[in-house]
């Protein structure tokens, strides 16, 4: 079977982008009060919740279409690092009832975004000729 890295990157971008966009749509429908509360609990300004929402929406859309993929992935990964540190750090190596790592969802988002920072969007991206692609 022939390898197609660009098709793999397209599937990867679509997966991360669509899954994150669902979080953004949820906040669009239900508001950002939950995130505001979480931010306030750890001493961060509540207005950052709007930045989280923008990232979950705008960066996700940019990943989906492949426009400035690496730049979108930087924002995406930054939000995931903060989310991991805020809500998912303790206990770090805990397993859930099914045997899965409790933090595997956020880790997939975080490391997926990190991977796209290094690879870019690939041949099937909307933009490909900029350092942020």
Which residues does each predicted region cover?
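Extended, low-polarity transmembrane helix blocks
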Residues: 1-29, 47-54, 58-133
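Membrane-interface interhelical connector segments
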Residues: 29-43, 48
């Amino acid at each position: 079977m022939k390898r197609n890295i660009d098709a793999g990157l397209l599937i990867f971008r679509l997966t991360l982008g669509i899954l994150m966009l669902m979080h953004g749509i949820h906040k669009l429908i239900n508001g950002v009060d939950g995130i505001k509360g979480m931010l306030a609990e750890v001493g961060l300004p509540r207005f950052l919740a709007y930045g989280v929402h923008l990232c979950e929406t705008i960066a996700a859309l940019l990943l989906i279409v492949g426009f400035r993929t690496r730049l979108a992935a930087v924002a995406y990964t930054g939000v995931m690092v903060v989310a991991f540190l805020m809500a998912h750090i303790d206990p770090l190596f805990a397993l859930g009832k099914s045997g899965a790592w409790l933090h595997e969802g956020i880790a997939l988002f975080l490391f997926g975004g990190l991977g796209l920072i290094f690879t870019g969007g690939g041949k099937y991206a909307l933009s490909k000729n900029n350092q942020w692609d």
